[in-house]
Curated annotation (Swiss-Prot):
Gene name in the database record: frr
Record's protein name: Ribosome-recycling factor
The entry's keywords: Cytoplasm, Protein biosynthesis
GO biological process per UniProt: translational termination
Domain of life: Bacteria
Function per UniProt: Responsible for the release of ribosomes from messenger RNA at the termination of protein biosynthesis. May increase the efficiency of translation by recycling ribosomes from one round of translation to another.
Recorded family membership: Belongs to the RRF family.
GO cellular component annotations of the record: cytoplasm
GO MF annotation: an example: ribosomal large subunit binding
Annotated region described as Disordered, given as residue ranges: 136-156
UniProt keyword Signal, yes or no: no
PANTHER family, A to Z: MITOCHONDRIAL RIBOSOME RECYCLING FACTOR PSEUDO 1, RIBOSOME RECYCLING FACTOR
Organism the protein comes from: Trichodesmium erythraeum (strain IMS101)
Location(s) in or outside the cell: Cytoplasm
């Protein structure tokens, strides 16, 4: 693994962390809250967003209008079974999800969940660093590169690691600020 590959993988880890942050409730309506909701549709799990139009009419409401009206009950069941923590209101053609204001206790739970997701992102980046350093050491052992080049490359990998971990910390701080602001 070279430095460029390691950096690309670290960038992907950042994107994955951002996406996982988007699934955490902040007290505002956001279509990405439903990204992980899978609906059992004709025997196979299907992403909700691929079988319905998801709208945000106001800051505290999400509307779900399925392309196939017969799937309303299945969507409602999938939302109830998911860990979204919202109760669907089915009016026969549209499902509405009202987003209640988060209590201080619930906000703290969400902050902890976000911190855990950030830590998973950091671990992922550290694993990429470990793989890159192992690859560099292997090249040094095989005499493909000198000891000085090896040390230089390992330092560069560490600097990239520090940069991307700092980026995750920035994302976490911004998300926590978003969640704790009422």
């Amino acid at each position: 693994m070279n430095l460029k590959e390691a950096e690309e993988k670290m960038q992907k880890a950042i994107e994955a962390t951002k996406n996982s942050f988007n699934t955490v409730r902040t007290g505002r309506a956001n279509a990405s809250l439903l990204d992980r909701v899978m609906v059992e549709y004709y025997g196979s799990p299907t992403q909700l967003k691929s079988m319905a139009n998801i709208g945000i009419p106001d800051a505290s409401t999400i509307t779900i209008q399925p392309y196939d009206k017969t799937s309303l009950g299945l969507i409602e069941k999938a939302i109830n079974m998911s860990d979204v923590g919202l109760t669907p209101n089915n009016d026969g053609s549209i499902i509405r999800l009202n987003i209640p204001a988060l209590t201080a206790e619930r906000r703290q739970e969400m902050v902890k969940k976000t911190a855990k997701l950030a830590e998973e992102g950091k671990v992922s980046i550290r694993n990429i660093r470990r793989d890159a350093v192992d690859s560099i050491r292997k090249q040094e052992k095989n005499s493909d590169i000198s000891k000085d080049e090896s040390r230089d490359l390992q330092d560069k990998v560490q600097k990239k690691t520090d940069k991307y971990i700092a980026k995750i910390d920035e994302l976490l701080a911004a998300k926590e600020k978003d969640m704790t602001t009422v």
